[in-house]
């Protein structure tokens, strides 16, 4: 078989069918998973290009392989564009994921056994910020801070107390499920007080930071990490930023050869495309719409009597606390899925249920905002979600409500077609 003569549908019908079905699924549902988004055809084209063939260990101009002239140009473009996007002096675009971006910073700045201080998982933190099952919780002495038990907001005085007590080498700000703004300046004050490095993981809010809709951590941190998907609407991958170019040199060495081998040049090219898209004026309008849509979604659920954690949102995340409703997050997410609405079960602060069950759900607006949804559409979505939750409160077999909402979902999404070719 000459592999160059056949297309996917000729070579592997099974994978071709899977991709077709997934395309149909993405077109057919209301996507509320806060960490997901839809990339442009241009990003897809770069990601699926022949750049996937090129091995390029090292950095631009200092590769261990010949023939890297063109991929060097692609990586240089990605770096210059993202530095402009975030107004910073240093960027590394090679990390394969946000988790590996975090690991590279740890490898650059810490030694095994050093103390790190990050947000606990049940308060909205991320696995890589010191959770016990993660390497960050195994290699380091990981201490966690929580949100306030009454307001569910970050308690900066408590973080300062813990920092004074434990003297961390690294203080981490960032989250996977926290709906309010972060005071990076306050974090830096705490870090300086105890002589710690300060890292911000902005994987969820990178788009908000890039457009000025959230305080930038760049002036206050030693290192900033992010994913390149989520609100940045690029390919799945990671990113590291800093204004400290000496720390940048350490991070470069930590990522390669310390942590990774060859970078994924097709992904880096796709990152460059996404960064160019994000430098356009339309992107700022998009992020503003993401936030407005999240506020509309939260308000519509509150009107239906559901508890929204912290009473609302400043970003793209809406956390629904289902404790008083007697519904688990798992039950709610599965029922919503059958009704054509995808989200994820999510722990709420001080949750006593299993992380596989949870007492809440996490909703997000980036993906459907990309499709073109506005506030009025998210008000409708909020009522659809509430209809499913109402049904679960009264009857664990929620088939009737699911079918009704699925019909409404199908009607709404037909107004917002995408990936049509």
Swiss-Prot record:
InterPro entries: PyrdxlP-dep_Trfase, PyrdxlP-dep_Trfase_major, PyrdxlP-dep_Trfase_small, Ser_HO-MeTrfase, Ser_HO-MeTrfase-like, Ser_HO-MeTrfase_PLP_BS, SHMT-like_dom. It is an enzyme of class 2 (transferase). Its EC number is 2.1.2.1. Its main location: cytoplasm. It is found in: Cytoplasm. It catalyses: (6R)-5,10-methylene-5,6,7,8-tetrahydrofolate + glycine + H2O = (6S)-5,6,7,8-tetrahydrofolate + L-serine. Pathway: One-carbon metabolism; tetrahydrofolate interconversion; Amino-acid biosynthesis; glycine biosynthesis; glycine from L-serine: step 1/1. The record marks 229 as: Plays an important role in substrate specificity. The modification N6-(pyridoxal phosphate)lysine is found at residue 230. One of its GO terms (molecular function) is pyridoxal phosphate binding. The keyword Amino-acid biosynthesis applies. Its cofactor is pyridoxal 5'-phosphate. Homodimer. Catalyzes the reversible interconversion of serine and glycine with tetrahydrofolate (THF) serving as the one-carbon carrier. This reaction serves as the major source of one-carbon groups required for the biosynthesis of purines, thymidylate, methionine, and other important biomolecules. Also exhibits THF-independent aldolase activity toward beta-hydroxyamino acids, producing glycine and aldehydes, via a retro-aldol mechanism. Belongs to the SHMT family. This is Serine hydroxymethyltransferase. The lineage of its organism: Bacteria, Pseudomonadati, Pseudomonadota, Alphaproteobacteria, Rickettsiales. The gene is glyA.
């Amino acid at each position: 078989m000459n592999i160059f003569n056949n297309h996917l549908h000729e070579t592997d019908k099974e994978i071709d069918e899977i991709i077709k079905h997934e395309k149909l699924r993405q077109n057919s549902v209301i996507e509320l998973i806060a960490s997901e988004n839809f990339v442009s055809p241009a990003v897809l084209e770069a990601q699926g290009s022949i750049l996937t063939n090129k091995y390029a260990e090292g950095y631009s101009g200092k590769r261990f392989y010949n023939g890297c002239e063109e991929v060097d140009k692609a990586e240089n473009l990605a770096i210059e564009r993202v530095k402009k996007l975030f107004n910073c002096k240093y960027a590394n675009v090679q990390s394969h994921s946000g988790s590996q971006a975090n690991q590279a910073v740890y490898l650059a700045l810490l030694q095994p056994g050093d103390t790190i201080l990050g947000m606990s998982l049940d308060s909205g933190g991320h696995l890589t910020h010191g959770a016990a099952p993660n390497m960050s919780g195994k290699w380091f002495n990981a201490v966690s801070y929580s949100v306030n038990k009454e307001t569910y907001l970050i308690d900066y005085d408590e973080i300062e107390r813990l920092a004074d007590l434990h003297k961390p080498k690294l203080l981490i700000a960032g989250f996977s499920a926290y709906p309010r703004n972060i005071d990076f300046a306050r974090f830096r004050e705490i870090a300086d007080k105890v002589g710690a490095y300060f890292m911000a993981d902005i994987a969820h809010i990178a788009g908000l930071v890039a457009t000025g809709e959230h305080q930038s951590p760049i002036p206050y941190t030693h290192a900033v990490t992010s994913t390149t998907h989520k609100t940045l609407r690029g390919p799945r991958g990671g990113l590291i930023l800093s204004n400290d170019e000496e720390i940048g040199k350490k991070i470069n060495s930590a990522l390669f050869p310390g942590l990774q081998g060859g970078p994924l040049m097709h992904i880096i090219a796709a990152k460059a495309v996404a960064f160019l898209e994000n430098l356009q004026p339309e992107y700022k309008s998009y992020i503003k719409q993401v936030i407005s849509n999240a506020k509309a979604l939260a308000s519509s659920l509150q009107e239906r009597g559901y508890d929204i954690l912290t009473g609302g949102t400043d970003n793209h995340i809406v956390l629904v606390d289902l404790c008083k409703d007697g519904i688990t997050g798992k039950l709610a997410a599965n029922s919503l899925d059958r009704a054509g609405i995808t989200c994820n079960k999510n722990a709420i602060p001080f949750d006593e249920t299993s992380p596989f069950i949870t007492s809440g759900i996490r909703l997000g607006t980036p993906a459907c905002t990309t499709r073109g949804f506005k506030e009025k559409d998210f008000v409708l979505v909020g009522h659809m979600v509430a209809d499913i939750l109402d049904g679960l409160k009264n009857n664990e077999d929620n088939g009737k409500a699911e079918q009704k909402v699925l019909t409404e979902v199908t009607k709404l999404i037909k107004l917002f077609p995408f990936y049509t070719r």
